[in-house]
Regions:
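Short acidic, glycine/serine/threonine-rich loops at helix termini
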Residues: 14-18, 88, 128
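Alpha-helical transmembrane segments within multi-pass membrane transporters and channels
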Residues: 78-80
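Short secondary-structure boundary/capping elements
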Residues: 54-61, 84, 106-109, 132-139
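Conserved phosphate-binding/catalytic loop of the ribokinase/pfkB sugar-kinase fold
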Residues: 100-105, 115-140
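Glycine-rich phosphate/adenosyl-contacting loop at the front of the ribokinase-like
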Residues: 1-76
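A glycine-rich helix N-cap at a beta->alpha junction
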Residues: 91-108
Length: 140
């Protein structure tokens, strides 16, 4: 392996929404909101229809791009032993990324970014770091 990235392992959850959803939830269209409260995040998610999930996070996205350019790459991140964590791991493996991770059965879910796409294709993001935000030197 020639290139290794360390970052937040975040599953991008893509959902189509109407403009009304953005305003009703006090979101700022086209921006990203960091959500610290899991209940607030789950409340948003409960009202959405998931179109697609993708392994994401800025470092992982860069590593995937480098893999697609035929580089030998790896990524270090932290996921939970849950459905989204499994999807995250599978997504990176499909992109030929060696994934070095700490996978824990904890009450903290895998990090997730809701990507809310309005009819004009504008993206508004709501990110809950979950366990990704708990990565430490012990995980590396």
């Amino acid at each position: 392996m020639k290139i290794l990235g360390i970052g937040n392992a975040i599953v991008d959850v893509i959902c189509k929404v109407k403009e009304q959803f953005i305003s009703q939830n006090n979101l700022s269209k086209g921006n990203m909101k960091l959500i610290f409260n899991e209940n607030e995040f789950q409340k948003l998610l409960a009202n959405l229809k998931i179109e697609k999930t993708v392994s994401g996070g800025s470092v992982a996205n860069s590593i995937v791009g480098l893999s697609q350019l035929k580089n030998e790459v790896g990524f270090i991140g932290k996921i939970s032993d849950d459905d989204l964590g499994n999807k995250y791991e599978e997504g990176l493996r499909k992109e030929n990324v060696d994934f070095f991770y700490t996978k824990k059965k904890e009450n903290i879910p895998t990090g997730t970014c809701l990507i809310l796409v309005t009819p004009d294709s504008e993206r508004t993001m709501c990110t809950y770091l979950g366990i990704a935000g708990k990565i430490s030197e012990n995980d590396v």
